[in-house]
Protein backbone atom coordinates (compact mmCIF):
# COMPACT_ATOMS: atom_id res chain seq x y z
CA UNK A 1 0.00 0.00 0.00
CA UNK A 2 2.87 2.31 0.84
CA UNK A 3 4.45 1.62 -2.55
CA UNK A 4 1.18 2.51 -4.24
CA UNK A 5 1.01 5.80 -2.33
CA UNK A 6 4.60 6.61 -3.33
CA UNK A 7 3.75 5.87 -6.96
CA UNK A 8 0.71 8.16 -6.84
CA UNK A 9 2.78 10.90 -5.22
CA UNK A 10 5.43 10.49 -7.92
CA UNK A 11 2.79 10.85 -10.66
CA UNK A 12 1.44 14.00 -9.03
CA UNK A 13 4.92 15.45 -8.51
CA UNK A 14 5.90 14.83 -12.13
CA UNK A 15 2.59 16.12 -13.44
CA UNK A 16 2.60 19.13 -15.71
CA UNK A 17 -0.27 20.64 -13.74
CA UNK A 18 2.04 21.67 -10.90
CA UNK A 19 4.30 23.60 -13.30
CA UNK A 20 1.45 24.96 -15.43
CA UNK A 21 1.50 28.78 -15.59
CA UNK A 22 -0.84 31.50 -16.78
CA UNK A 23 1.54 32.04 -19.69
CA UNK A 24 1.18 28.40 -20.72
CA UNK A 25 -2.61 28.74 -20.62
CA UNK A 26 -2.54 31.88 -22.78
CA UNK A 27 -0.25 30.27 -25.35
CA UNK A 28 -2.37 27.12 -25.52
CA UNK A 29 -5.34 29.40 -26.17
CA UNK A 30 -3.32 31.13 -28.92
CA UNK A 31 -2.58 27.71 -30.41
CA UNK A 32 -6.27 26.76 -30.35
CA UNK A 33 -7.22 30.05 -32.05
CA UNK A 34 -4.63 29.41 -34.76
CA UNK A 35 -6.00 25.87 -35.19
CA UNK A 36 -9.46 27.35 -35.67
CA UNK A 37 -8.20 29.85 -38.25
CA UNK A 38 -6.26 27.12 -40.06
CA UNK A 39 -8.95 24.46 -40.26
CA UNK A 40 -12.25 26.34 -39.99
CA UNK A 41 -11.29 29.49 -41.90
CA UNK A 42 -8.63 27.84 -44.12
CA UNK A 43 -5.88 30.37 -43.33
CA UNK A 44 -2.83 28.52 -44.76
CA UNK A 45 -4.05 25.25 -43.14
CA UNK A 46 -1.09 23.17 -44.32
CA UNK A 47 1.27 25.42 -42.38
CA UNK A 48 -0.67 27.18 -39.63
CA UNK A 49 -2.22 23.86 -38.57
CA UNK A 50 1.05 22.15 -37.58
CA UNK A 51 2.46 25.45 -36.24
CA UNK A 52 -0.58 25.85 -34.00
CA UNK A 53 -0.42 22.29 -32.68
CA UNK A 54 3.32 22.65 -32.10
CA UNK A 55 2.51 25.77 -30.07
CA UNK A 56 0.12 23.75 -27.90
CA UNK A 57 2.72 21.02 -27.36
CA UNK A 58 5.46 23.54 -26.53
CA UNK A 59 3.41 24.90 -23.65
CA UNK A 60 2.86 21.58 -21.89
CA UNK A 61 5.28 21.77 -18.92
CA UNK A 62 7.84 19.00 -18.48
CA UNK A 63 7.19 17.66 -21.98
CA UNK A 64 10.66 16.14 -22.31
CA UNK A 65 11.16 17.51 -25.81
CA UNK A 66 14.89 17.99 -25.17
CA UNK A 67 15.28 14.39 -26.37
CA UNK A 68 13.72 12.12 -28.96
CA UNK A 69 11.93 12.95 -32.19
CA UNK A 70 10.88 16.45 -31.10
CA UNK A 71 14.52 17.34 -30.48
CA UNK A 72 15.37 16.09 -33.97
CA UNK A 73 12.54 18.16 -35.50
CA UNK A 74 13.81 21.26 -33.69
CA UNK A 75 17.33 20.48 -34.91
CA UNK A 76 16.02 20.36 -38.48
CA UNK A 77 15.23 24.06 -38.14
CA UNK A 78 18.21 25.18 -36.06
CA UNK A 79 20.60 23.31 -38.37
CA UNK A 80 18.88 24.83 -41.44
CA UNK A 81 17.85 21.48 -42.94
CA UNK A 82 14.14 21.97 -43.59
CA UNK A 83 13.98 25.37 -45.41
CA UNK A 84 16.29 24.28 -48.27
CA UNK A 85 14.30 21.05 -48.68
CA UNK A 86 11.10 23.11 -48.92
CA UNK A 87 12.80 25.16 -51.64
CA UNK A 88 13.60 21.95 -53.52
CA UNK A 89 9.88 21.22 -53.70
CA UNK A 90 9.01 24.82 -54.55
CA UNK A 91 11.50 24.73 -57.42
CA UNK A 92 9.92 21.56 -58.78
CA UNK A 93 6.53 23.29 -58.77
CA UNK A 94 7.73 26.57 -60.31
CA UNK A 95 7.56 27.52 -63.97
CA UNK A 96 10.10 30.26 -64.73
CA UNK A 97 8.79 30.51 -68.30
CA UNK A 98 6.86 33.80 -67.80
CA UNK A 99 9.96 35.38 -66.26
CA UNK A 100 12.22 34.17 -69.06
CA UNK A 101 9.72 35.37 -71.68
CA UNK A 102 9.57 38.84 -70.12
CA UNK A 103 12.86 39.38 -68.23
CA UNK A 104 12.04 42.96 -67.25
CA UNK A 105 9.50 41.59 -64.75
CA UNK A 106 12.53 40.59 -62.68
CA UNK A 107 12.69 44.28 -61.76
CA UNK A 108 9.14 44.10 -60.40
CA UNK A 109 10.17 41.22 -58.15
CA UNK A 110 13.07 43.36 -56.93
CA UNK A 111 10.89 46.46 -56.43
CA UNK A 112 8.45 44.53 -54.26
CA UNK A 113 11.28 43.91 -51.78
CA UNK A 114 11.03 47.55 -50.72
CA UNK A 115 8.57 46.39 -48.07
CA UNK A 116 11.35 44.31 -46.51
CA UNK A 117 13.57 47.34 -46.02
CA UNK A 118 10.72 49.64 -44.92
CA UNK A 119 9.88 47.18 -42.13
CA UNK A 120 13.58 46.78 -41.32
CA UNK A 121 13.91 50.53 -40.82
CA UNK A 122 10.72 50.66 -38.78
CA UNK A 123 11.89 47.83 -36.54
CA UNK A 124 15.20 49.56 -35.83
CA UNK A 125 13.33 52.77 -34.95
CA UNK A 126 11.28 50.76 -32.45
CA UNK A 127 14.39 49.51 -30.70
CA UNK A 128 15.06 46.14 -32.30
CA UNK A 129 18.67 45.26 -33.07
CA UNK A 130 19.84 45.24 -36.69
CA UNK A 131 19.74 41.43 -36.76
CA UNK A 132 16.24 41.29 -35.29
CA UNK A 133 15.03 44.03 -37.64
CA UNK A 134 16.34 42.15 -40.69
CA UNK A 135 14.60 38.95 -39.61
CA UNK A 136 11.35 40.88 -39.09
CA UNK A 137 11.65 42.77 -42.38
CA UNK A 138 11.89 39.63 -44.50
CA UNK A 139 8.23 38.93 -43.60
CA UNK A 140 7.45 41.44 -46.36
CA UNK A 141 8.82 39.04 -48.95
CA UNK A 142 5.81 36.76 -48.32
CA UNK A 143 8.08 33.72 -48.25
CA UNK A 144 7.66 31.52 -45.18
CA UNK A 145 10.73 29.27 -45.58
CA UNK A 146 13.01 32.27 -46.21
CA UNK A 147 11.56 34.04 -43.16
CA UNK A 148 12.26 30.97 -41.03
CA UNK A 149 15.75 30.57 -42.52
CA UNK A 150 16.75 34.19 -41.82
CA UNK A 151 15.17 34.24 -38.36
CA UNK A 152 17.08 31.07 -37.45
CA UNK A 153 20.31 32.73 -38.57
CA UNK A 154 19.84 36.19 -37.08
CA UNK A 155 17.13 36.11 -34.38
CA UNK A 156 16.17 32.56 -33.34
CA UNK A 157 14.36 33.85 -30.22
CA UNK A 158 11.85 35.61 -32.54
CA UNK A 159 11.31 32.64 -34.85
CA UNK A 160 7.80 31.73 -33.66
CA UNK A 161 6.40 35.26 -33.91
CA UNK A 162 8.01 35.85 -37.31
CA UNK A 163 6.74 32.56 -38.75
CA UNK A 164 3.18 33.11 -37.49
CA UNK A 165 3.14 36.66 -38.88
CA UNK A 166 4.57 35.56 -42.24
CA UNK A 167 2.14 32.70 -42.83
CA UNK A 168 -0.85 34.62 -41.45
CA UNK A 169 -0.30 37.52 -43.82
CA UNK A 170 0.40 35.17 -46.72
CA UNK A 171 -3.07 33.72 -46.20
CA UNK A 172 -4.51 37.26 -46.17
CA UNK A 173 -2.91 38.37 -49.46
CA UNK A 174 -6.33 38.43 -51.24
CA UNK A 175 -7.58 40.84 -48.55
CA UNK A 176 -4.46 42.99 -48.04
CA UNK A 177 -3.38 43.61 -51.63
CA UNK A 178 -6.49 44.79 -53.59
CA UNK A 179 -7.05 48.04 -51.63
CA UNK A 180 -3.37 48.97 -52.04
CA UNK A 181 -3.44 48.09 -55.75
CA UNK A 182 -6.51 50.25 -56.34
CA UNK A 183 -5.10 53.13 -54.29
CA UNK A 184 -2.02 53.47 -56.50
CA UNK A 185 -3.58 52.82 -59.93
CA UNK A 186 -6.22 54.48 -62.08
CA UNK A 187 -9.16 52.70 -63.68
CA UNK A 188 -7.52 53.18 -67.08
CA UNK A 189 -4.28 51.57 -65.91
CA UNK A 190 -6.11 48.58 -64.45
CA UNK A 191 -7.88 48.03 -67.77
CA UNK A 192 -4.63 47.70 -69.79
CA UNK A 193 -4.48 44.46 -71.79
CA UNK A 194 -0.94 43.12 -72.17
CA UNK A 195 0.42 41.34 -75.23
CA UNK A 196 0.65 37.54 -75.17
CA UNK A 197 4.00 36.23 -73.96
CA UNK A 198 6.33 34.49 -76.39
CA UNK A 199 6.88 30.75 -76.16
CA UNK A 200 9.93 29.76 -74.11
CA UNK A 201 12.12 26.89 -75.34
CA UNK A 202 13.10 23.90 -73.24
CA UNK A 203 16.76 24.89 -73.64
CA UNK A 204 16.07 28.30 -72.07
CA UNK A 205 14.23 26.70 -69.16
CA UNK A 206 17.18 24.38 -68.47
CA UNK A 207 19.89 27.03 -68.82
CA UNK A 208 18.12 29.62 -66.64
CA UNK A 209 18.38 27.80 -63.26
CA UNK A 210 21.99 26.83 -63.93
CA UNK A 211 23.15 30.35 -64.82
CA UNK A 212 21.09 31.91 -62.03
CA UNK A 213 22.54 29.57 -59.41
CA UNK A 214 26.14 30.18 -60.43
CA UNK A 215 25.87 33.98 -60.71
CA UNK A 216 23.74 34.69 -57.62
CA UNK A 217 25.59 32.17 -55.44
CA UNK A 218 28.93 33.72 -56.34
CA UNK A 219 27.49 37.13 -55.50
CA UNK A 220 25.82 36.02 -52.24
CA UNK A 221 27.30 32.67 -51.09
CA UNK A 222 25.23 32.67 -47.89
CA UNK A 223 22.03 31.79 -49.79
CA UNK A 224 23.55 29.04 -51.92
CA UNK A 225 21.72 26.32 -49.98
CA UNK A 226 18.31 27.96 -50.53
CA UNK A 227 18.83 29.08 -54.11
CA UNK A 228 20.69 25.93 -55.11
CA UNK A 229 17.90 23.66 -53.92
CA UNK A 230 15.27 25.89 -55.56
CA UNK A 231 17.01 25.65 -58.90
CA UNK A 232 17.80 21.94 -58.54
CA UNK A 233 14.09 21.27 -58.05
CA UNK A 234 13.37 23.36 -61.13
CA UNK A 235 15.91 21.37 -63.14
CA UNK A 236 14.13 18.16 -62.11
CA UNK A 237 10.95 19.71 -63.52
CA UNK A 238 12.35 21.03 -66.78
CA UNK A 239 14.90 18.37 -67.76
CA UNK A 240 12.22 16.02 -69.06
CA UNK A 241 14.13 12.94 -67.90
CA UNK A 242 13.71 13.12 -64.10
CA UNK A 243 9.95 12.95 -63.74
CA UNK A 244 10.15 10.67 -60.70
CA UNK A 245 12.46 13.07 -58.86
CA UNK A 246 10.27 16.02 -59.82
CA UNK A 247 7.13 14.24 -58.66
CA UNK A 248 8.70 13.25 -55.33
CA UNK A 249 10.06 16.76 -54.74
CA UNK A 250 6.77 18.55 -55.37
CA UNK A 251 4.55 16.04 -53.57
CA UNK A 252 5.80 13.48 -51.03
CA UNK A 253 8.99 15.31 -50.00
CA UNK A 254 7.61 18.83 -49.64
CA UNK A 255 4.52 17.56 -47.81
CA UNK A 256 6.63 15.58 -45.34
CA UNK A 257 9.10 18.40 -44.73
CA UNK A 258 6.25 20.91 -44.34
CA UNK A 259 4.91 18.86 -41.41
CA UNK A 260 8.29 18.88 -39.67
CA UNK A 261 9.13 22.53 -40.49
CA UNK A 262 5.78 23.87 -39.33
CA UNK A 263 5.60 21.69 -36.21
CA UNK A 264 9.18 22.59 -35.29
CA UNK A 265 8.37 26.27 -35.70
CA UNK A 266 5.39 25.86 -33.38
CA UNK A 267 7.66 24.24 -30.79
CA UNK A 268 9.55 27.55 -30.48
CA UNK A 269 6.36 29.33 -29.35
CA UNK A 270 6.76 28.80 -25.62
CA UNK A 271 5.24 31.39 -23.30
CA UNK A 272 8.59 32.81 -22.23
CA UNK A 273 9.56 33.53 -25.86
CA UNK A 274 6.22 34.54 -27.38
CA UNK A 275 4.35 36.54 -24.74
CA UNK A 276 5.91 39.98 -25.09
CA UNK A 277 5.36 43.43 -26.55
CA UNK A 278 7.88 42.45 -29.21
CA UNK A 279 5.44 39.91 -30.63
CA UNK A 280 2.75 42.56 -31.14
CA UNK A 281 5.29 44.88 -32.77
CA UNK A 282 6.42 42.07 -35.10
CA UNK A 283 2.82 41.42 -36.20
CA UNK A 284 2.29 45.15 -36.90
CA UNK A 285 5.61 45.48 -38.74
CA UNK A 286 4.76 42.41 -40.81
CA UNK A 287 1.62 44.13 -42.06
CA UNK A 288 3.64 47.26 -42.89
CA UNK A 289 6.10 45.09 -44.81
CA UNK A 290 3.34 43.43 -46.86
CA UNK A 291 1.69 46.73 -47.71
CA UNK A 292 5.05 48.29 -48.55
CA UNK A 293 6.00 45.40 -50.83
CA UNK A 294 2.69 45.56 -52.68
CA UNK A 295 2.93 49.34 -53.08
CA UNK A 296 6.55 49.15 -54.24
CA UNK A 297 5.72 46.62 -56.94
CA UNK A 298 2.69 48.55 -58.20
CA UNK A 299 4.54 51.88 -58.28
CA UNK A 300 7.42 50.34 -60.22
CA UNK A 301 4.83 48.82 -62.56
CA UNK A 302 3.50 52.34 -63.17
CA UNK A 303 7.05 53.48 -63.98
CA UNK A 304 7.48 50.62 -66.46
CA UNK A 305 4.14 51.57 -67.99
CA UNK A 306 5.44 55.10 -68.60
CA UNK A 307 8.72 53.87 -70.06
CA UNK A 308 7.25 51.30 -72.47
CA UNK A 309 4.44 53.52 -73.72
CA UNK A 310 1.54 52.00 -71.82
CA UNK A 311 2.18 48.31 -72.52
CA UNK A 312 2.55 47.21 -68.88
CA UNK A 313 -0.43 46.86 -66.56
CA UNK A 314 0.85 48.12 -63.16
CA UNK A 315 -1.29 45.52 -61.37
CA UNK A 316 1.24 42.80 -62.14
CA UNK A 317 3.73 44.64 -59.93
CA UNK A 318 1.87 43.58 -56.79
CA UNK A 319 2.71 39.97 -57.66
CA UNK A 320 6.38 40.76 -56.98
CA UNK A 321 5.96 39.41 -53.46
CA UNK A 322 6.75 35.71 -53.48
CA UNK A 323 3.39 34.30 -52.37
CA UNK A 324 3.21 31.91 -55.36
CA UNK A 325 0.76 31.72 -57.08
CA UNK A 326 -1.65 33.57 -54.77
CA UNK A 327 -0.31 37.07 -55.50
CA UNK A 328 -0.50 36.45 -59.26
CA UNK A 329 -4.11 35.33 -58.89
CA UNK A 330 -4.92 38.55 -57.02
CA UNK A 331 -3.50 40.56 -59.95
CA UNK A 332 -5.71 38.53 -62.29
CA UNK A 333 -8.85 39.06 -60.18
CA UNK A 334 -8.37 42.82 -59.77
CA UNK A 335 -7.55 43.21 -63.47
CA UNK A 336 -10.58 41.17 -64.55
CA UNK A 337 -12.88 43.31 -62.39
CA UNK A 338 -11.62 46.43 -64.19
CA UNK A 339 -11.76 44.78 -67.62
CA UNK A 340 -13.56 41.40 -67.90
CA UNK A 341 -11.59 40.60 -71.05
CA UNK A 342 -8.26 41.03 -69.30
CA UNK A 343 -6.08 38.00 -68.57
CA UNK A 344 -3.07 38.96 -66.45
CA UNK A 345 -2.31 35.66 -64.71
CA UNK A 346 0.65 34.54 -66.85
CA UNK A 347 2.04 38.09 -67.01
CA UNK A 348 1.83 38.30 -63.21
CA UNK A 349 3.59 34.95 -62.78
CA UNK A 350 6.79 36.58 -64.08
CA UNK A 351 7.20 39.01 -61.17
CA UNK A 352 5.71 36.39 -58.83
CA UNK A 353 8.48 33.85 -59.40
CA UNK A 354 10.98 36.72 -59.57
CA UNK A 355 9.83 37.57 -56.06
CA UNK A 356 10.95 34.14 -54.85
CA UNK A 357 14.45 34.90 -56.12
CA UNK A 358 14.24 38.51 -54.93
CA UNK A 359 13.35 37.55 -51.37
CA UNK A 360 16.22 35.05 -51.25
CA UNK A 361 18.60 37.72 -52.56
CA UNK A 362 17.32 40.23 -49.97
CA UNK A 363 17.88 37.63 -47.25
CA UNK A 364 21.36 36.89 -48.56
CA UNK A 365 22.23 40.58 -48.66
CA UNK A 366 21.18 41.05 -45.04
CA UNK A 367 23.03 37.91 -43.99
CA UNK A 368 26.21 39.15 -45.67
CA UNK A 369 25.88 42.50 -43.91
CA UNK A 370 24.81 41.35 -40.45
CA UNK A 371 25.78 37.73 -39.75
CA UNK A 372 29.24 38.67 -38.46
CA UNK A 373 28.06 41.57 -36.29
Annotate the PLM regions.
Residues 75, 79-80, 87-93, 108-118, ...:
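Alpha-helical membrane segments and immediately flanking helix-loop junctions
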Residues 213-300:
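Transmembrane helical segments that form the transport core of multi-pass membrane transport proteins
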Residues 39-48, 67-73, 93-108, 242-251, ...:
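Interfacial helix-loop-helix linkers and transmembrane-helix boundary segments
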Residues 6-19, 37-41, 53-81, 235-256, ...:
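Hydrophobic transmembrane alpha-helices of multi-pass solute/ion transporters
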Residues 99-120, 270-297, 348-352:
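Entry/N-cap segments of selected transmembrane alpha helices
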Residues 157-175, 285-293, 316-319:
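Alpha-helical transmembrane segments
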Residues 16-27, 71-86, 132-140, 167, ...:
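Structural signature of hydrophobic alpha-helical transmembrane segments
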Residues 168-241:
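Membrane-embedded hairpin module used as a gating/binding unit in multi-pass transport
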